[in-house]
From Swiss-Prot:
Superkingdom of source: Bacteria
Name assigned to this protein: Elongation factor G
Record-linked NCBIfam families: EF-G, PRK12740.1-5, small_GTP
Domain tr-type G: 8-283
Subcellular location: Cytoplasm
Pfam families: EF-G_D2 (PF22042), EFG_C (PF00679), EFG_III (PF14492), EFG_IV (PF03764), GTP_EFTU (PF00009)
Organism: Rickettsia africae (strain ESF-5)
Gene (UniProt): fusA
GO terms classed as biological process: ribosome disassembly
Family the UniProt entry places it in: Belongs to the TRAFAC class translation factor GTPase superfamily. Classic translation factor GTPase family. EF-G/EF-2 subfamily.
GO molecular function ontology, one term from the record: GTPase activity
Purpose of the protein: Catalyzes the GTP-dependent ribosomal translocation step during translation elongation. During this step, the ribosome changes from the pre-translocational (PRE) to the post-translocational (POST) state as the newly formed A-site-bound peptidyl-tRNA and P-site-bound deacylated tRNA move to the P and E sites, respectively. Catalyzes the coordinated movement of the two tRNA molecules, the mRNA and conformational changes in the ribosome.
GO cellular component: cytoplasm
Length: 699
């Protein structure tokens, strides 16, 4: 197969969903039917091929997105298995960044759940074409048609139903293919490997005709010629329908909806056919956004094998046999083992050693990879998640990923001095793998503090520290990751002088600090940042080489705010003037001056304490609504909406994280164990003054 042609044959897809919708089982079945997995792994027995970390097998949830390559028909499918638990949305976000298409798996009983909405919104952000697989059609209470309605109501999506279920709950035995207008039935005894086509059952003829008409109405809109044909009563061919479904899926005009039961081995092969037929190849995506290093210009780069090499590192993993593995998505050009490329974000050269194609936890050595491929590189020194690897002669930086601020923190200390050094190494390794996990030192207590996206996130990282790095540690109680900010513009002129004997130090800085939301001319790339620095020095008042010292000083000192020592966020610092001394000035002197200017200037900016606000969704039977709403109000919650769902009520509220510790037990007793809840980070907001006083007193 020629290299150019090969791009058309690649499908880079993610399989994403809410926890427990059956995502890992679906991936397992795909690997089984594409011949990559010799036995079917069951998640609830702790044996799935994709869930290869020990904790994943015990908990039955997927944590790291393992990348797997398999083949179907004559196509190469690279699958990224993404986690569905809300604490791991960072994993979903970074895998979506490098995918061309996705399969969203929904639970046929529960329908669209909170995490499904989060993942859907993330996929919208990266414009990922996707299709929907309504799974668990064999379960008690499964309702395909309700699921389709929920796709419209809760996601605002335009579903295009291309299959209907045959039989319900335990009698589910196959699907109706609305393109071919045939029923596809699976033989139970053949592990789903054998299935056959037959005529649509008589009792489903009318429903199939109704949904076929809806399908045609939607797809013919995309092509005037086919629409004329359809309106004049001519038959639209299966090939024409497929071509238009592909066109509409790639342009996100609609989302094809399929159904099945991965666990019962029904519906997986047609799902694979649909991945190949309807989801885009890298050629359909066409371009990737980035910046040309030599000119600093933003550009669209074509996805092509003949262009210079450019790839994005989207995941780092520690492999027990190979060591550190960096997963990259190649957007253009090709890469050969043994060559040298440049990390354009860090401006460091990297030698390409071993290159691997991954199959869950097995690996295959390869010598060459090209545009469209997702491969793992062993032994890179300086590359972290979100970095670009590029051709040395034509350097580009691809669009970077954004990572959310952590909302929860824990103090950890090693149990023995032997653990001390190992813990430092373990934490830095884990932080390199996961950009939403941060490690810092509390300056006052000297304790090591780890920060993450939720209790489960930190629990699993501590568990990995014990298992993989053999580090025993004492763990403190979870703490809320408060932040600080300023609410008004302030200016400070500060001179740092130390000129009494010996080498002197001199630096003067004049800095304007302002809340980000009040900055009028904020650049697009700065809109999602928590701290922006700009130099407006003219005429050499501060030489160019000293300005990075000012930025570094501010970046370091903002980790310790002026109210209660929490990191300062959402502000801009502009260096507008300054002075230097020919002999006594240095980068360090300007760093010290910037820190002192921050300490002196920030109190003038009317600083406020911020706390993480969580979006909480509670699903409860009617009779407990009053008590649950009363309890959420008592937790400083603000009710956003109340909607019926089936025979239950769904309450959505914004509640400070500080008030949500231990909520699971309260909810259980309020509802006799019948209500359930989920929460995701929403935003930071000001802490009411009486609560802020208590927090300050504790510090």
């Amino acid at each position: 197969m020629s290299k150019i042609n090969k791009l058309e044959h690649i499908r880079n897809i993610g399989i994403c969903a809410h926890i427990d919708a059956g995502k890992t089982t679906t991936t397992e079945r795909i690997l089984y039917y594409t011949g990559k997995s010799h036995k079917i792994g069951e998640v609830h027995e702790g044996g799935a091929t994709m869930d290869w970390m020990e904790q994943e097998q015990e908990r039955g949830i997927t944590i790291t997105s393992a990348a797997t390559t398999c083949r179907w028909q004559d196509k190469i499918i690279n699958i990224i298995d993404t986690p569905g638990h809300v604490d791991f949305t960072i994993e979903v976000e970074r895998s979506l960044r490098v995918l061309d298409g996705a399969v969203a798996v929904f639970d046929g009983v529960a329908g669209v759940e909170p995490q499904s909405e989060t993942v859907w919104r993330q996929a919208d952000k990266y414009n990922v074409p996707r299709m929907c697989f309504v799974n668990k059609m064999d379960r008690m209470g499964a309702d395909f048609y309700r699921c389709v309605e929920m796709l419209k109501d809760r996601l605002g999506a335009k579903p295009l139903v291309i299959q209907l279920p045959v039989g319900i709950e335990e009698n589910f035995k196959g699907i109706i293919d609305l393109i071919k207008m045939k029923a596809v039935i699976w033989k139970d005894e053949a592990l789903g490997a054998e299935y056959f086509e037959e005529d649509i059952p008589a009792d489903m003829k009318d429903k199939a005709e109704e949904y076929r008409a809806k399908l045609l109405d939607m797809v013919v809109e995309l092509d005037d010629h086919v629409m004329e044909k359809y309106l004049s009563g001519e038959e639209v061919t299966a090939e024409e329908i497929k071509r238009l479904i592909r066109k509409g899926t790639i342009s996100a005009a609609f989302y094809p909806v399929l159904c099945g039961s991965a666990f019962k081995n029904k519906g997986v092969q047609p799902l694979l056919d649909a991945v190949v037929d309807f989801l885009p190849s890298p050629i359909d995506i066409g371009i990737v956004k980035g910046m040309e290093v030599s000119t600093g210009e933003e550009k669209d780069f074509p996805i092509s094998v003949t262009e210079p090499f450019a790839a994005l590192a989207f995941k780092i993993m520690n492999d027990p046999f190979v060591g550190s593995l960096t997963f990259i998505r190649i957007y253009s050009g090709k890469i050969i083992s043994g060559t040298t490329v440049i990390n354009t974000v860090k401006n460091k050269r990297e030698k390409i050693g071993r290159m691997l194609l991954m199959h869950a936890n097995n690996r295959e050595d390869i010598k060459e990879a090209s545009a469209g491929d997702i491969v793992a590189l062993a032994g890179l020194k300086d590359t972290t998640t979100g970095d670009t690897l590029s051709d040395i002669d034509q350097q580009v930086i691809l669009e970077r990923m954004e990572f959310p601020e952590p909302v929860i923190e824990l103090a950890v200390e090693p149990k023995s001095t032997a653990d001390q050094e190992k813990m430092g190494l373990a934490l830095s390794r884990l932080a390199a793998e996961d950009p939403s996990f941060r490690v810092s030192t509390d300056y006052e207590t000297g304790q090591t503090v780890i920060k993450g996206m939720g209790e489960l996130h930190l629990e699993i990282l501590i568990d990995r520290m014990r298992r993989e790095f053999k580090v025993e540690a004492n763990i403190g109680a979870p703490q809320v990751a408060y932040r600080e900010t300023i609410t008004k513009v302030c200016e400070i002129d500060y001179t740092h002088k130390k000129q009494s004997g010996g080498a002197g130090q001199f630096a003067r800085v004049k800095i304007i600090f302002e809340p980000l939301k009040e900055v009028k001319d904020l650049k697009d790339e700065d809109k999602n940042k928590i701290f922006v620095f700009e130099s407006k020095i003219v005429g050499g008042a501060v030489p160019k080489e000293y300005i990075p010292g000012v930025e570094k000083g501010l970046n370091n000192i903002r980790e310790t705010g002026v109210i209660a020592g929490y990191p300062m966020i959402d502000f801009k610092a502009t260096l507008v003037d300054g002075a230097f001394h020919d002999v006594d000035s240095s980068v360090l002197a300007f760093e010290i001056a910037a820190k002192a200017a921050f300490r002196e200037g920030m109190p003038k900016g009317n600083p406020k304490l911020l706390e993480p606000i969580m979006q909480v969704e509670v699903i409860t039977p009617d009779e407990y609504m009053g008590d649950i709403i009363g309890d959420l109000n008592s937790r400083r919650g603000q009710i956003q909406s109340m909607d019926p769902r089936g025979n239950a009520q769904v309450v959505t509220a914004n509640v400070p994280l500080a008030e949500m510790f231990g909520y699971v037990n309260t909810l259980r007793s309020l509802s006799q164990g019948r209500a359930q809840f989920s929460m995701i980070f929403s935003h930071y907001d000001q802490v009411p003054s009486q609560v802020a006083d208590i927090i300050k007193a504790k510090k």
